[in-house]
């Protein structure tokens, strides 16, 4: 197991690493969150754009020019994909630790780095720290707070647990020892469909995860991204590739895998999924009952409307046939 770089009296303790591809709508939020960090140690910000076709490069350039002592920007001349781009920019890090945040997410705790670094510096067996997070939609609407603590997302806790559940540690909350991150980057498949899944497995294999149960970060969902394909075919392809990765990693570190624990985790995940499907089935049945009841009410209302319309037609026909008698009857109502 490798330790991170020794702390330099001159260089940064932490390298914030941000990857971006067509996140022009949100990248400004991410960068401002980096700049607002309150620490008692120096840190640097590395931002790499993967040949975006939107205004992302212009925004990144603006910040880099305004904060030349803090921000270093990199621009791919052709699109490499998230995994290769991540590996490439990590090699530029000068800090003892790497803090990841993707361009569509952002930090909301100004002491995020300070808290996580303190945990890692005092730890004897952990080189990796993550936190809880909130969830928002592309338009900024918050859908969930403290997603892990409130059980909205499954929190990954170990190698076996992650293999069985495809759980979450939320990459944009990570702080990892740089040397360990570089070692892991050398071990992952550069063609991975989701680099964070492979990275998490490699990290869990090598170190313990320190978890801070505070929502320091906002995770943006509901838009097209590598981890959330909008197209159903792409989504299925992603799930198939993730299954391939799960099977690959069962064999890759077979000598270290606790298969009893893996079986327990798999059975638990399967049971939880069945419970969720039963709930969904119950909700669908109830929805069908409600729809049927509403349709019956609509049919009854439609029938009443027709009766009223027929009655009005009858009265109108009578008025036209016997106008004087009809007028006398109406006039008599107002005496």
Language model regions located:
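Glycine-rich, basic loop-to-helix element that forms the pyrophosphate-binding segment
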Residues: 76-93, 115
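Conserved nucleotide-sugar donor-binding catalytic segment
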Residues: 131, 150-242
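Short aromatic/hydrophobic "clamp" motif used to bind/position activated sugar donors
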Residues: 98
